[in-house]
Amino acid sequence: MPSRRSALRWMAAGSGLAALTPKSSSAAPASPLKHGKIKQSIVHWCFERGSKWKVEDTIKAAKELGCVSVEGLAPQHWDLLKANDLKCAYVGAHGFVKGMNQPAFWDANLKVIEERINQCAEYGNPNVLSFTGFADTTAQGGGVVSLEQGKKNCIEAYKKIIGHAEKKGVVLLLEHLNTRDSAEMKGHPGYQGDNIDYCAEIVRGVDSPNMKLLFDIYHVQIMHGDILRRLESCKDIIGHIHTAGNPGRCEIGADQEINYPPAMRKLLEIGYTGYVGHEFIPTKDPMVGLREAVTLCDVA
């Protein structure tokens, strides 16, 4: 449990938040949520990048829209989240280049993963994010690893830490990313885990209820499509969901190709109870895009 000192920090953090408002002229006061069957979350980095939002802006938006989490925030921001009754649905550990597919990076990665697991357990946050890494990290002090060896290495590495995650009641997530889009942060050419079935094999190979798949609908659409059947095929191992519009990792809506309401209904059908994080880079007023996303994903 957090210490008394942490509790005092939560109170101090919360007292200043009411004076902050998201940097948007279109924010309406009423939450768009009606059904609330999907636990919706906002991924902060997108709005920091696209709209120059501060953490306080994203928290304010989450509260206004009825979201229950602001995710991807480092632990130093968790007191502020706690003060506003919000979770951090996932926290990052190591990066997506130097991942778990190469033993050269195991020591550093496992150290920070263990630290994040402990922090999540203390604050009651559910997930720590991890990556396969790039196939070729020669320039980063690693080497070149084949698909098969990369899979074996990932499974071996995760088995070194998964017992600690189980003990602490925290889930370790593996994220699938697309390699087709070369635009910065819209795709990740060189990433080894660009096949959803490959990532699913790693997760299942670890064979733990605390090892799950981060199913990013945007990335899966670019690499594979067939979203609804892929959600079905992964239903036993999905631990987190991300959204964004395609093409362009833009807002969710009528101007892009992914139809999100059926995907959300599919999640309810397969019994998914985790978070759905909105991870699009805004191209217009961010509150307009977020409000639309929250409304589209608020299915009955």
Give, region by region, the residue ranges found by the protein language model.
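Catalytic domains of carbohydrate-active enzymes, especially glycoside hydrolases
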Residues: 57-77
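Histidine-acidic metal/acid-base catalytic patches
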Residues: 2-63, 125-126, 184-185, 193-215, ...
